[in-house]
A protein has these predicted regions:
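Nucleotide-sugar-dependent
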Residues: 91, 203, 245-281
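Carbohydrate-associated surface elements
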Residues: 155, 173
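Conserved catalytic-core segment of nucleotide-activated headgroup transferases in glycan assembly
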Residues: 14-29, 38-39, 175-181, 185-254
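Nucleotide-activated donor-dependent transferases that construct or modify glycoconjugates
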Residues: 2-15, 42, 194-195
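An aromatic- and histidine-rich active-site surface loop
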Residues: 11, 20, 84-107, 113, ...
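A short, charged, and often flexible helix/loop element on the N-terminal side
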Residues: 42-73, 87-88, 93
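Acceptor-binding helix/loop patch of EC 2.4 sugar-transfer enzymes
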Residues: 43-58, 110-140, 168, 175, ...
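Membrane-proximal helix-turn-helix segments that form the acceptor-binding/catalytic region
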Residues: 68-80, 94-107, 112-113, 118-120, ...
C-alpha cells in the first residue's frame, strides 16, 4: 500500500518559484517510487492573483476567510497522511495555530522547509496595512515543533539550529537535464539585460532603474522583465514578457546578461540565489 505525503504550502501549485524548485519538480519522481501526493495550498488561484494587487479589499477578505476555512477542514484529513511537509507556513496570516494543532494536539510529526529569512518583516507596499497580521515570530515555533527542518542555505540553517537540532541544508536546485537545458544565441548585436521574478520581488529593481536609464544614454540594448505582472516604471529600453510555465525557458534564453539585484541586509543573507542559478544554467 502506497504512503501519502501531504504538502501544506502557501501558494497554488505551479505558481511560486520557491515551491516549484524546492519540491514540486520532484513530485513525479516520488509518485514513480510509490508515493501518493496531495498538495494543499493556503491560497487558491483567485486569491493569489488578487492578494498582491492594489484595492480589492473585499475580495481579499473573502479569499483569506475561505483559505482559513479550507485549512480548518484539512485538519480532519490529516489522518490520511503518512508524512506531512510544511513549506514556509500553513497560513500566511496569524499565529501558528495550525502548526500547533498538528504538532501538539494531533501529535503528528512534520518536516518544515524554508528558503528565505521569513522571520523578518518583508512585505509589499500594496499590503502594508495587513503586515501586522503576518506574525513573523511564528516561524521560530514552526521550527521548534518540527521533526526535521530543511533549509535553503547555511545562513538559514544556522538560524534554525537555535530552535531545532535536526536541520539539513537542501539548496534550491535546477533541473538541467529536463528543464534548464536550452542553448542561447549570444551572437546578437543588441544585448538584452534581463530580470525574472514575481511581482512581489520587483521592488529590488527600484535602485537599478536609474542605472538602466543612464545606460540608455550610452548604449543600445533591451531591458527585459519576465514576471507575472508588468512593472510600474517606464524605460525606453523596457520589454515585458508575461511569465508562463510553458515558455519560461524560451523566454530566459533571450537574456544576454541576467541580473539579480539585492540589498546588503539580513534579509538578503537568506536568499538562495535562485535567479543566478537560472541564468547560469542556460548555455
Amino acid at each position: 500500500m502506497s504512503e501519502t505525503i501531504f504538502f501544506i504550502v502557501p501558494y497554488p501549485f505551479g505558481e511560486a518559484p520557491s515551491q516549484r524548485f524546492r519540491f514540486e519538480q520532484y513530485l513525479t519522481f516520488l509518485e514513480e517510487n510509490g508515493f501518493k501526493i496531495e498538495i494543499h495550498p493556503f491560497l487558491n488561484e483567485s486569491t493569489w492573483k488578487t492578494l498582491y494587487r492594489e484595492g480589492n479589499v473585499g475580495k481579499k477578505i473573502i479569499g483569506i476567510t475561505g483559505s482559513f476555512y479550507r485549512r480548518f477542514l484539512l485538519l480532519f484529513q490529516l489522518r490520511r497522511a503518512n508524512h506531512i511537509f510544511i513549506h514556509r507556513e500553513a497560513a500566511q496570516l496569524g499565529p501558528p495555530i495550525f502548526e500547533w494543532i498538528i504538532a501538539k494536539v494531533l501529535r503528528r510529526k512534520y518536516i518544515y522547509d524554508f528558503d528565505d529569512a521569513i522571520w523578518l518583516p518583508n512585505y509589499s507596499e500594496t499590503n502594508a496595512r495587513f503586515q501586522r497580521l503576518k506574525s513573523y515570530w511564528k516561524v521560530n515555533y514552526c521550527m521548534k515543533w518540527a521533526e526535521k527542518i530543511t533549509a535553503g542555505n547555511a545562513y538559514l540553517a544556522n538560524y534554525a539550529l537555535q530552535y531545532n537540532p535536526t536541520v539539513q541544508i537542501i539548496p534550491t536546485t535546477i533541473d538541467t537535464i529536463h528543464h534548464h537545458n536550452r542553448k542561447c544565441d549570444q551572437s546578437t548585436k543588441k544585448p538584452t539585460i534581463g530580470w525574472t521574478g514575481t511581482h512581489t520581488t520587483m521592488h529590488y529593481l527600484d535602485e537599478i532603474v536609474p542605472i538602466i536609464r543612464d545606460l540608455e544614454n550610452h548604449f543600445s540594448f533591451d531591458f527585459l522583465i519576465i514576471s507575472n505582472e508588468p512593472p510600474s516604471f517606464e524605460l525606453a529600453s523596457l520589454k515585458f514578457i508575461k511569465w508562463t510555465k510553458e515558455t519560461e525557458i524560451e523566454d530566459l534564453a533571450k537574456i544576454t546578461i541576467g541580473i539579480m539585484p539585492l540589498k546588503q541586509d539580513i534579509w538578503s543573507e537568506g536568499k538562495c540565489g535562485f535567479k543566478g542559478l537560472q541564468y547560469m544554467a542556460l548555455e
